[in-house]
Amino acid sequence: MVVRENTMAIQNRRLGKHGVMVSNLCLGTMNFGWKTDEKESFAIMDRALELGINFFDTADTYGWGGEEGDTELLLGRWFALGGGRRDAVVLATKVYNPVKRKENRPEVNTDGRYLSAYKIRKGAEASLKRLKTDHIDLYQMHHIDRDCPWDEILQAFDHLGAQGKIVYTGSSNFAGWDIATACQEAGKRGFMGLSSEQSIYHLNNRTIELEVIPACRHYGLGLIPWSPLAGGLLGGVLQGVQDGRRLSDDMKKEIAKHRTKIEKYEALCAKLGESPSTIALAWLLANPAVTAPIIGPRTVKQLDESIRATEVTLSESTLKKLDAIFPGPGGEAPKAYSW
């Protein structure tokens, strides 16, 4: 059963234990300047603010339709339009990989460490320039760097914070152990440490329930799930095929691998009278550990459709049915391992 509550349910939540308030949906910008042109990207961002979505996520390497960094440049042009746009947004971006652009010499990381102090400082300065802003609200490590010492990494982020160039530090794609280590090492040095973790999390991939979610809860991190629709697998893909939608080879393989589950899932969504994408997002929003799933609309229409997930509450019986279709890992560690 699905209970429809109100017609506008974008809510603000704290980012973990921290005081900043962010919308319970995060606007992902990976498609901007690639699958979505600049005009439509601007319209999506304007509409997001109208709807109450104030949390925007990007990365320094986004822009695969042209050059890496193009998405940050696009956001910078949108901020430059004024009208309070920058002040209205809690802006998150990421650092880790070299950003390849034609006008730059190839970026050489002589020590091979992608979270070296040199790389973090250089990455922040370049992102600030592209984004046309003086600060990044949430600066995230895009991946773990197991070679660079935490002393160097944490001090680099702390220095940026002291300079007013970043406000909060986040992680992405970290294991529970990595989160715990980062938070412990930051605490030893009197640094604020991590404020959030961005992980892949959806009905068909619940691995982070073992250790990442417990680590986020213990250390007070906000959780920002990416790929909430499993790249489209949870977005009504089988119905789409019937309607003539063309699929990539990768998606065909995913369907073949998970067809039984997806058939049951789409049938359940039909009985509930909601789209599969709505149910997938609503399932994440029902988890108190989740701060804001990242949505990646390619059109304003898709953005508006995403809002429906915030307007419904899934009943306990529906949650149990979803668990039966997509069983989790068996609980949190070490409970999932021991008996």
PLM regions and their residue ranges:
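N-terminal binding-site loop/beta-alpha segment at the start of enzyme catalytic domains
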Residues: 2-90, 162
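Short, acidic/polar
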Residues: 36-48, 115-130, 179-183
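Acidic (Asp/Glu)-rich catalytic clusters
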Residues: 79-86, 128-132, 161, 183-189
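Active-site groove signature of glycoside hydrolases
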Residues: 128-148
